[in-house]
Amino acid sequence: IGLELDVLPVNNFRMYEKLFPHSEFVDISPMIRKLRSVKSAYEIDLMRKAAELNDSMFAYARQILRPGMVEMEFAGLLEAFLRKREHQGLVRVRSFNNEVFYGHIMAGVNLAVPSCSVGPTGGPGPNASMPQGAGTRVIRENEPVQIDYVGSYKGYIVDQARTFFIGQAGEEFLNVHDLALKIQQAIMEKGKAG
């Protein structure tokens, strides 16, 4: 019997051992990961549509972002924009019955706040029981506002982030941004289609 032993809880595995005591169990996790790592043309098209949804959300963000908005207010407007366009909300990740929230918005010093998130972004979140993403901080002029959202279309996802400024970005920020673009280009040169 093939099981995904990299994500299946031990209690579940023990239950299957009791239900099928004369069976051999095989870890098919590597096979599934390899199969899912290369996308068909159909799947790539769905991922493109998810990216287009995110692109339209980023364009909308550019139109509505204003100093004085609270991070959670801004997040709510963007989340409503996405949901009205069939974003599924929670997104599935490779884990056992695990879904994650689909985005983080952080501004200014909140960009440096660590959180419970396993991803690269954090943020204080709305409260201590959900310490990640948008919080109650007011967005100010001349500070970075980062939007890191997962676009989703029919179960296929793309994770994209953009940083906005209301006003002017400082020289140090622009230098780091240039470095990030160089790293992105190097990664793109190493990648392959599918």
Regions found by a protein language model. Give the residues of each.
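Active-site neighborhoods and metal-handling regions in enzymes and metal-associated proteins
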Residues: 1-194
